[in-house]
Amino acid sequence: MNVEEYIVARVNALMHTEDAVIVKRLEGGMSNYTYVVETRGKRYTYRVPGKYAEKFVDRVEEWDNIQEVNRLGLNNATSYVEVISGEKLAEYVEGTIMSETDIESYNELSVAALKCIHSSDLRFKDYNAFGRLDDDERYCREMGFTHPKAYVELRHKLDAMRAAHADVKMVPCHCDYQPTNLVIDEKGTKLYVLDWEFAGMNDPFYDIACYGNAGFDKALSLLKAYVCHEPTSEELKRLYFHRCFQCLQWFNVAIFKDRVGLSKDLNMDFNNVATFFFDMAKDLADKYDTL
């Protein structure tokens, strides 16, 4: 049974139907299998996590996050989460994925969603960014990888940046606020924020930095819209710091995925992905000192 046949069978079982059909696979992410499925005239998404996804996501925490964020009306309705396997069935949102648009033209809509999240009383756990990075580095070492000297030096520099921004107030954050996780409804007036598995208490600029996955210029543009003025040196440094951190995190995730065989399984060179993110992290760290 291939993954599409499996998903059809699971949706039929969960929805007590026999007419589930695959509509399409959704792109995005580095290894998950997420499909749009239709049954009884209604569309859903079904997610099957990729190999070793459990290393990076606590599914019980994801379920708790979903229950919390439902109060804001920003996410799609989740019908089912299997906390052991990480499989998830949710209602499909008709609209346009932000990454497929002129992203900056929707900054006002995006800022409104961010400020709704950041000013809320949602109760999330501490995101614990550097604890996560420590874990990611350890996973790589356990697979026989030795971080090169250039990485160690950059990590030390990142630790120094962290100390400089230690007093920032933590607020509820999505922590994966990249345009592929945002959907604009068909009227163009409402933004849905999807995939809350990484949500936690964090610096609100961390969410803005996530826009860098679509190009760091997008994060800079969103920052200006968020603060409603030309960003100060301190504000820019916070953004550069968080994006540098994210790039090092992606570096380790990509190295791990290559070491467990996902480069071959998914026909994606994760070593090249790792190099891309490391080079970006180094560039951001170098520019940080000039701000």
Segments and roles (model prediction):
Residues 237, 241-244:
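Start-of-helix signal in alpha-solenoid helical-repeat scaffolds, especially tetratricopeptide repeats
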Residues 205-232, 244-263, 272-280:
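Active-site activation/catalytic loop segments of kinase-like enzymes and analogous catalytic loops
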Residues 26-129, 149, 167:
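ATP-binding pocket architecture of kinase catalytic cores
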Residues 32-38, 45-46, 159-206:
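Active-site acidic catalytic loop and adjacent metal/ATP-binding pocket
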Residues 277-290:
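Amphipathic alpha-helical coiled-coil segments
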Residues 51, 95, 191, 199-201, ...:
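Activation segment
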Residues 3-19, 120-175, 180, 185-187, ...:
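An alpha-helical support segment within catalytic cores of ATP-dependent transferases
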Residues 62-63, 106, 209-211, 268:
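Glycine-rich, phosphate-binding/catalytic loops in enzymes
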